[in-house]
Amino acid sequence: MSRLPAAKRREQLLDTAVGLFAERGYSGATTSELAKAAGVTEPIIYRHFKSKKDLFIAVIERTSDLTLEMWERGLAGAKDPAQRLRRLVGSNPMVSEQGRGVYRVVVQAMMEIEDADVMRALQVHISRIHQFVTREVAVAQDAGQVSKRFSPEIQAWMLLHLGLGYGVMAPLNVPSHASDTAGVRVRDVISELMLGERARHLLDERLTRIKDRGGDIRDED
């Protein structure tokens, strides 16, 4: 067992816990299994986390941080609020290469909501995600690119509900569950409903880029 600085050891334990909790769930995973997977002894785990539940909650909190960081990187360089919102609609952490593992832990956590501490951690997680999306919708509204008929808060909830449903269905591999025979995707429909003409303009730009490369509409996010 190699010695690591405390901060790096904590990160290593969190990384290992993500995979274990995602596969076995909170109830099914044990600290003994975690210690073995991380190459440490159980007392090392308890130096960093008071209990298995404390570790599980830390993983949920880390998922929030990783999701917001991923979104910030993905939205960087967008030329206007409408494009930021369109990118956000297409950036579901539940199905992304980076996010799907950690988000399986969130789904597992939803099975443990009888525990008040886990429930509270999930509520904080969802609230942070909702606040981020709400700000993006509000900025697009202020720029005149999204209708103000509905509040940014309720539109953000709509996006989260759709994103969660998509994320749950995606692993089932139901044929064409997210697009039709013409290749139009759910994200295109959502974007047009929210952004109207601006969404159509962004879609036309994307189609032109794909056509120039000789590709297919489903080749680009």
Positions of the model-derived regions?
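Amphipathic alpha-helical segments used for helix-helix packing
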Residues: E97-D117, V168, L172
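Helix-turn-helix
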Residues: Q12, L20-D54, A58
